């Protein structure tokens, strides 16, 4: 395991180690990528806990098992040593992400955008997104200058999202402020 991880500002969380698997140092990983197996495309991970960068590890192998991945990391051969990694977030530098088509965004790109309704009212800023199964949901929290102090859950759908202006840091939405 290497102790020279990338800058914390450049890292994006793509998964989390949540337990051990077997006795040979494998770990169970919950992947935030879609599809789940895309996490295995990144061979070097930065592990962190509670927001602080901790260490870099190298992926040896991984396999899909039900709704999680079972992963073997270089130099990790003991169940008890593997148990110490439970709870660590798996991060990779954002520059390793593939380019997207026009009009497509990674969640981290949407976080922090101001959300403005069709009447020009500031509803708040996107704090984070949730995967619900049917569609993604934006958690919009109040900010300075927002209409009120309400937290809103807005669907990330074509019907709701009218326009995204990354340069201005804004998203226009079709949404009733009273809802």
UniProtKB/Swiss-Prot annotation:
PRC barrel domain boundaries: 102-179
Entry-linked InterPro entries: PRC_barrel-like_sf, PRC_RimM, RimM, RimM_N, RimM_N_sf, Transl_B-barrel_sf
Top-level taxon of the source organism: Bacteria
Subcellular location: Cytoplasm
GO cellular component: cytoplasm; ribosome
Keywords: Chaperone, Cytoplasm, Ribosome biogenesis, rRNA processing
Subunit relationships: Binds ribosomal protein uS19.
Family (UniProt): Belongs to the RimM family.
Free-text note regarding domains: The PRC barrel domain binds ribosomal protein uS19.
The name this protein goes by in its record: Ribosome maturation factor RimM
Native species: Pseudomonas syringae pv. tomato (strain ATCC BAA-871 / DC3000)
Encoding gene per record: rimM
